[in-house]
Amino acid sequence: MDKLKIFNEFLDRDEAYETLNYFSRNFNKGWDPWVAEVQSPTGYVPGNAFWRMKLSDEKLFSERILKKIESKTNKRFTLLDVYGNGQTNGQDGSWHVDDSQDGTYTFLLYMTYNPIIESTNYNTIGGYTGFSINGLIINVEPFTNRGVLFRSNIIHRGLAPQKPNIFRISIAYKLKEIT
């Protein structure tokens, strides 16, 4: 597999609408402040703070979109976790790996909706996901409804929007490949 596999327009129109509507309806509930622990040379240390929404109990995410991930990637997965990441200006993520075990993958689905992030505005909004691969930093634009699949041991971080009053949303799937 290539290091990163990108899927533009991952969800069809109705699925994207339903997903965006879910976050719009639940904006004022369900987002909890969260500080991830990140691995450093001296052990685990607190990373930067951002927002997190548990999605594992929602069938839209834990079943329907998971099946779409499997269909589009031609892989079968066990779902380890799924949650929403939320970031506002100043909440850049820390460099980290999600899982160092063999056969684990992360799938990110960008779902920022106010505004929709697309090719005409991404350069002023920011919110890239940075990947450190073979000594290079590769930034992936967080276009709304774009999916990115990568092995969970790749060092990466989510960058916050450059402008205030924008809430960058990505859905993070933690997956174990079934072989």
Name each model-derived stretch.
Residues 1-76:
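Non-heme Fe(II)/2-oxoglutarate
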